């Protein structure tokens, strides 16, 4: 959106093929934009078949894309069912929530230009038995990863060790750090929005660095 309020399409296809259903997006301070494109929610007659872009010119989804500052689009990494995205405070790691059928958080290591140089499973949420899936994903200012999952919002330290689960009256779907000090957690659940004050603020959005702001 420009100063006049005009909305423009940033990217509408990959190599001539339509996206499946872009889901989440995050911006790096180097100008790269990352977004997820899951699959499996198209009409049956639009499911992929062998070919460069599948039936009805649809890609099969299940990818994390990287949009470079010059407009070049590439596949950063394939993923079973990529959903939420978050960047570590130093922006060297991109976290990806994998929703179905395996419930993981992937950690993608990035070089200075924002290309993938390594990848690993950061956390395994498959052992949870309560309602909830990896979807909303955020990082706080000391690098801890917050992710919706079975039972609530999972809080995981930078080494991948589970610290605990923040529980809510109903299933958590997505959330954000907000307020003047980024110490209020706003959580969207199935029927309501909840708030919780936390001791450690959320990590400021990377674009604040370009503007010389801290919150």
Mark where each language-model region is.
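Blade-edge beta-strand/turn elements of extracellular beta-propeller
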Residues: 2-16, 61-81, 109-129, 153-168
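Structural signal for beta-propeller blades
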Residues: 41-43, 62-64, 102-105, 153-154, ...
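Asp-box/WD-like beta-propeller blade repeats and closely related beta-sheet repeat scaffolds
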Residues: 1-53, 58-61
